[in-house]
Amino acid sequence: AGFSLDMTGMENIYLKGYLLGLNDDQIKEIEQDIIDFADLGEYIDQPVRTYSSGMKMRLGFAININIKPDILVVDEALSVGDADFQKKCRDKINDVIATGVTVLFVSHSRKAIEETCTRAIFLKDGKVQVDGTVEEAFDAYDKKK
């Protein structure tokens, strides 16, 4: 997630915001949404080096989903965390998609892809095998197994 490990979660929210071109007011506007979504409790004020990998993922996802990106890249975000957090992520991704943001969703979970995507690209050995509907991509995948 590209965190500064000696900085706190809160400091990393601002660092990521600055790196993405946001100013103090813009970051302050989304700060509480990030904190609430990440749900790290008191750990938000602890150095990121004390976080588990799941906690880092939660904070990274919370930052990236709340900055209102033009393109959102989600790489296996739904493979970690408990079922409640995974559902919260799916719901938030669907909210972002509904606003017209392009989402590049990378997953090995058939269910997650079917619930999230309207288009899929099936890659094998780094080459595009199918670029079409989710059903077309899975049909091709099932035949190649």
Feature locations, PLM:
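A short, proline-enriched helix->beta-strand linker immediately N-terminal to the Walker B motif
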Residues: 65-74
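Conserved ABC ATPase "signature" C-loop
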Residues: 125-126, 141
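ABC ATPase "signature
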Residues: 131-132
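Helical segment within the ABC ATPase nucleotide-binding domain
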Residues: 86-99
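A short, surface-exposed alpha-helical micro-motif characterized by mixed small hydrophobic
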Residues: 113-115
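H-loop/switch region of ABC-family ATPase nucleotide-binding domains
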Residues: 107-108
